[in-house]
């Protein structure tokens, strides 16, 4: 490639705020894989937030880029998977498969789309030093003739419109609102944008923990569960943002609750043998968790915790939950899915327009 901006490039990031700030440009926060796309003639590369190439996993995007995008460009955006008027992140995760034959099959059966929201380069021009208002205008021109695969994200400078997006379209899979100062230059790996996301709370059972990478005397993360209507304990996610002193104190406190796997509801080895999907989810199946130790220490389900989360993806927290407080006053069996707040239904993600 011979572009003014070359891969790999870390995307510009956002920091969380509680309210949508005034006086900026606003966009929906799409729920998918962040990717910077590079096209130089017949060459196309899809980068990721971790600067790992994703090109081989989305051949349909590569093919569409050759017909829908300018001949030489670098575009920041989100790879998403539309399904039944919402975004399906679980199905999108399945696209990261090591087998080329399965990649080809999924590309045909569940094709992805690319939502473009920033421009880093066009032709011979580097746009990273230009203000966002100028980059946005150039991006609109660059995508004027785009086809069905590449889409320009809606944007507005009207605060009430941004607030409406935030409240109305969560149920379609939108992840909140992004705010960008109009004079903002493109700053890779810097948290200079702003994001506002939904926050909810849930009381969960702590049913296990993983050790911290520092050693065998500190907790790395706590595994959370909620009870089904039939009384089985379902795995819903983890919390892990603790100071080191708290990690060590938790390790000591939890030793009295350590159980064996034989009668633990999350005996993955036995369950995975009977359920290939469970084996994929907890035992691997994509390059992103290759080599990662997914083992854990089982606990009797007696410790309860209140956590903050943004939204669910299927039956699990979409992102890592955040610790709020311990709940010694609650009974474990009261920690059920019934307490969860469902987002309002949205008719379609495509209705998120100015």
Swiss-Prot record:
One of its GO terms (biological process) is DNA recombination. It holds the Pfam family DNA_ligase_A_M. GO terms for molecular function: ATP binding; DNA ligase (ATP) activity. Keywords: ATP-binding, Ligase, Nucleotide-binding. It comes from the Bacteria. The active site is at residue 29. It is an enzyme of class 6 (ligase). The keyword Nucleotide-binding applies. Its EC number is 6.5.1.1. Disruption phenotype: Not essential; a double ligC1-ligC2 mutant grows normally, no effect on NHEJ. In a triple deletion with ligD NHEJ on blunt-ended plasmid is 90-fold impaired. In quadruple ligB-ligC1-ligC2-ligD deletions NHEJ on blunt and 5'-overhangs is 0.22 and 0.12% of wild-type respectively; only 4-fold decrease in 3'-overhang NHEJ. InterPro entries: Adenylation_LigC-like, ATP-dep_DNA_ligase, DNA_ligase_ATP-dep_C, DNA_ligase_ATP-dep_cent, NA-bd_OB-fold, OBF_LigC-like. It catalyses: ATP + (deoxyribonucleotide)n-3'-hydroxyl + 5'-phospho-(deoxyribonucleotide)m = (deoxyribonucleotide)n+m + AMP + diphosphate. NCBIfam families: PRK08224.1 (NF006078). DNA ligase that seals nicks in double-stranded DNA during DNA replication, DNA recombination and DNA repair. Has weak intrinsic nick joining activities and accumulates DNA-adenylate. Acts as a backup for LigD in the Ku-LigD-dependent NHEJ pathway. PANTHER family: DNA LIGASE 1 (PTHR45674:SF4), DNA LIGASE 1/3 FAMILY MEMBER (PTHR45674). Belongs to the ATP-dependent DNA ligase family. This is DNA ligase C2. It comes from Mycolicibacterium smegmatis (strain ATCC 700084 / mc(2)155). The gene is ligC2.
